[in-house]
Amino acid sequence: MHLFIEVIAAFFTALSFGVLFNMKGKNLILAGIGGSIAWFSYKFLLNMGVTENLCFFIATVCFAIYCELCARIYMTPATTLSVCCLIILVPGYGIYNTMYSVLTNNYIKAVEYGVSTLSCASSIALGLVFITTVFRKVNLY
């Protein structure tokens, strides 16, 4: 039940960012579904015991494939969908902990949090670049 509530919250978060980016109609729903896919993939894998970086990578691959397919089916830019889905996975808590540790002069913890956050962000970037490159090189028509 807890995962279901988180997935619904991810849907509305992605949908809200779609509103912020002036998306309209069915694109808002597509963005919300993509955010739900991203968060469900991440949390499901995390609960299965997969490492956090791999969870971020696989969740990014899942929503990036979804966004690329929706972009081709509904003739909409994949970038706008991807950005709305990407917001869900941004490691904000790690960034907060890094800055908090710096401000409290706990530099060893700051480096630990910073490296962890940077590796999570890198996993997200690699997943998105990987799928985008594959879809640009492979012609589905």
Feature annotation, model-predicted:
Residues M1-R72, T76-A78, N97-Y141:
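Alpha-helical transmembrane segments and their membrane-interface boundaries
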Residues P77-C85:
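Membrane-helix boundary/juxtamembrane motif in polytopic membrane proteins
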Residues C84-N97:
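Hydrophobic alpha-helical membrane segments
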